[in-house]
């Protein structure tokens, strides 16, 4: 039986079908193997074989991925790789193209870390909404760490320099090894249950993933999330992340930074206190000045509205009117005297005795006439002044008081009491009578 033409494939077509089948059947997969025949040409790509005791397969990692490797791949090294299975069409060889490679020992831990992190994250253990805020002023701190490590020295040094008044309790523990995670968890739970601390700090220095593994324990992560006391995690270096970092309420990149985040610098605090004190003194002085100015203005308004002030104003007006009248009288007298002197000079220039006598008679008449007119003017002005005085006396509150009446005002604000419903039993009043003021109380 002869095949049909459309059933016959070329090698390239067959390789293409095989490649599509491989890539569709194998998504990104993980493989742990030993490296063999490692080659790195000038292009920067990596070519090698992945093998175990019974088989091997070709693999490649292109330069864009290979440049981020944290180690130098060598033949015989055991690695954990991730990539996809494909087929190199030109030679019909199937191979893996990798996007990730790490040493196998740490790689296994890394995979376990990622799986546990994903599971706890799905439960909401790392949600930002459940994290507790840090207290504004930490007074007592529990530090859970190794008593001999560099981390505790860094923390205590920074705390002593920045805020020596802080009370610090060191809770010593192992920070790596099989029993470290359980011991750290027990100390954390005990410190939280005591209720004595404002913050609990978990910390240790840097190390490999295996060295830091105690802080990736599931029970410890759950204890951190359940703690009622805020927890700060400062494990390893800035590039190291542990599950305790994600579960804690605050993650610090290093132990020293954690100490700086927890307490203020005493020098900055003292400077801020001095500035605040100066602002408070200035504000108090300004407030007092404003209050005194308001009191002065109120006193001026009160004085301006009192009966005594009105009476004083009328008296000043009366005195001013008298001075003006007296000045006008003097001016008129001066003008008339000047005319008389002028007339006398003219008379002295004429020799006939008869004219002189006549002029003297006229002069005598003229002298009497202004005096009479002036006397009448003065009498009329005096009468007008007496009338004004009687009018002022009639409207003066003090005149009313002198006739036996009294003026009632409130003691607290000086308000004039005009009606009964303005006062209540127990109110303090002042009664102004003719010769003084009497304090009274409403019953």
UniProtKB/Swiss-Prot annotation:
InterPro entries: Exonuc_VII_L, Exonuc_VII_lsu_C, OB-fold_nuc-bd_dom. One of its GO terms (molecular function) is exodeoxyribonuclease VII activity. GO terms for cellular component: cytoplasm; exodeoxyribonuclease VII complex. GO terms for biological process: DNA catabolic process. Keywords: Cytoplasm, Exonuclease, Hydrolase, Nuclease. The keyword Cytoplasm applies. Its EC number is 3.1.11.6. It is an enzyme of class 3 (hydrolase). Coiled coil: none annotated. It is found in: Cytoplasm. It catalyses: Exonucleolytic cleavage in either 5'- to 3'- or 3'- to 5'-direction to yield nucleoside 5'-phosphates. Heterooligomer composed of large and small subunits. Bidirectionally degrades single-stranded DNA into large acid-insoluble oligonucleotides, which are then degraded further into small acid-soluble oligonucleotides. Belongs to the XseA family. This is Exodeoxyribonuclease 7 large subunit.
């Amino acid at each position: 039986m002869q095949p049909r033409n459309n059933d016959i494939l070329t090698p390239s077509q067959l390789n293409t079908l095989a490649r599509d089948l491989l890539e569709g059947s194998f998504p990104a997969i993980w493989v742990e193997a030993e490296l063999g025949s490692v080659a790195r040409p000038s292009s920067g790509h990596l070519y090698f074989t992945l093998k175990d005791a019974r088989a091997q397969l070709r693999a490649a990692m292109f330069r864009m991925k290979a440049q981020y490797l944290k180690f130098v791949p060598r033949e015989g090294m055991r690695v954990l790789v991730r990539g996809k299975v494909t087929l190199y069409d030109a030679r019909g060889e199937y191979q893996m193209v990798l996007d990730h490679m790490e040493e196998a020992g740490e790689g296994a831990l890394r995979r376990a870390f990622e799986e546990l992190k994903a599971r706890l994250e799905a439960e909401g253990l790392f949600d930002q909404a459940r994290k507790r805020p840090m207290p504004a002023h930490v007074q007592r701190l529990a530090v859970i760490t190794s008593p001999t490590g560099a981390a505790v020295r860094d923390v205590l040094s920074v705390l002593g320099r920045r805020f020596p008044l802080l009370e610090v309790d060191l809770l010593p523990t192992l920070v790596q090894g099989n029993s470290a995670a359980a011991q750290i968890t027990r100390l954390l739970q005990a410190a939280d249950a005591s209720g004595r601390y404002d913050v609990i700090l978990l910390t240790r220095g840097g190390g490999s993933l295996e060295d830091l593994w105690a802080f990736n324990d599931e029970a410890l992560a759950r204890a951190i999330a359940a703690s009622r006391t805020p927890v700060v995690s400062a494990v390893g270096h800035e590039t190291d992340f542990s599950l305790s970092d994600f579960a804690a309420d605050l993650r610090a990149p290093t132990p020293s930074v954690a100490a700086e985040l927890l307490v203020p610098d005493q020098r900055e605090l003292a400077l801020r206190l001095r500035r605040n004190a100066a602002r408070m003194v200035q504000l108090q002085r300004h407030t007092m000045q404003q209050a005194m100015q308001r009191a002065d203005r109120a006193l001026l308004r009160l004085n301006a509205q009192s009966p005594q002030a009105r009476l004083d104003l009328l008296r000043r007006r009366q005195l001013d009117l008298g001075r003006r009248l007296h000045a006008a009288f003097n001016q008129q007298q001066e003008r008339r005297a000047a005319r008389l002197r002028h007339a006398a000079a003219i008379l002295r220039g004429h020799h006939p005795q008869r004219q002189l006598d006549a002029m003297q008679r006229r002069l005598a008449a003229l002298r009497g006439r202004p005096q009479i007119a002036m006397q009448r003017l003065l009498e009329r002005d005096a009468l007008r002044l007496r009338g004004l005085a009687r009018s002022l006396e009639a409207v003066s509150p003090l005149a009313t008081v002198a006739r036996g009446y009294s003026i009632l005002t409130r003691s607290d604000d000086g308000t004039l009491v005009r009606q009964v419903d303005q006062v209540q039993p127990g109110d303090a009043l002042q009664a102004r009578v003719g010769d003084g003021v009497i304090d009274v109380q409403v019953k």
